[in-house]
Amino acid sequence: MSDKYTGQCLCGSFRYSISTIDLEGAFSCHCIDCRRATGSAFAAVVPFKIDNFNGDVSVLKKLTHKGGSENDIHRYCCQDCYCPIYINVTRSGGMYLYTGTLDNISDITFSENRKFENGHFEYLNISNKKIEI
């Protein structure tokens, strides 16, 4: 675990620091919700506890939708550039930080790829910890 990580949104108007994150718990999610939320083939996230998060979350835009499980998913984004910062999945109670917002990602090890039936692009060769094109 690192003592401190920092990150920001795309436009830089929202900055944060986080005292600890689960460096070995990072994963890539290939579900349709994560693909749509990021506009990409998958979302790269890392679990964290909101108590360790330092930043004025009241300025973030909260976007809520029903996930594949029909439970609420809350995504918190910069209100200026709409860059996604973190997600709260109510079904599991999990809080996940989008790793792309971190200033330094060199210590993060992805533990797995979470893929679902018809939930990933066929051109991606996905194993548990590796993605190849």
Please describe what each predicted stretch is:
Residues 1-8, 13-133:
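A short Gly-Trp-Pro
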